[in-house]
Amino acid sequence: MKYVAVGAFPDITERKVKERARARVLSVKGSSEAALWTARRLRAIGYEVEGPVEVEVSVKAVEEAVRSALDTCDLVIVTGGVEPNSAPAFEGVAAALGRALVENEEAKQHVEEYYLLEATDGAASELFPLKRARALTLLPEGSTVFHNPRGPAPGILLEEGGRYLICVPGSLAEAGAIFEEEADPYVRSVIGAYFSTTVHVMTKTWEEDAVASVVEAVSEEAPWVFAQLKRTVRSKEGWGITVTVFAKSPDEL
């Protein structure tokens, strides 16, 4: 299906579209799967991608990695480093940008709603996010919050000197959902890739490793094509592979 993003994309600050743009994916230790997925998607959109670059789980390591990336990149993605009791990614990003960590009401509401829905005892669950998941509500000042439909940790977006910086959880399922449903318009706006077409290819196997090998081969041979196994796309005989191509004009599709 081909679509134009008019009406589907948020109101993004007007900016000059770049012919070429560079992105770096910073993978906080333990989030390599999400980082690899993100790097593949960015290449398909049209970015020159550096990484994933593994970063230790510490505020200082994230701060240094983000500072370095912002020197040369138009887009920086941080995967992982956000857990209910500790969010070194948020803290490190705040330090790198020289911004304060502030309690974000939208993030707080998201965390509370997530645990209220997950809990069997509503009264007990109300205390959980406030006492044990406060790290997920303290965000760098000026953050745009991305809703996470699959977990408690929100994604965030910040703009610094005309560059975008995005943080997503380390889980592939969570990072992918945030990216596709929330972050994509911002990422694509940098290079004007407002158009896309998607097809679903049905396989005849339930072997995930076999499907993964096909996805990897497509990524290596045609990096401008974004292929992924979608567990919600399947037939009676096997998994489906979702294939998306991005473009700057309908004529390119």
Regions found by a protein language model. Give the residues of each.
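Structural motif
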Residues: 24, 55-67, 74-76, 143-144, 163-166, ...
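Glycine-rich beta-strand-to-loop/alpha-helix junction loops that act as flexible
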Residues: 28-29, 48, 76-90, 248
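An accessory alpha-helical subdomain
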Residues: 164-253
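Polyanion/phosphate-binding surface patch
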Residues: 73-76, 243-245
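Proline/glycine-rich low-complexity loops and linkers
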Residues: 61, 71, 84-191
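Glycine-rich phosphate/diphosphate-binding loop of Rossmann-like nucleotide-binding domains
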Residues: 3-57
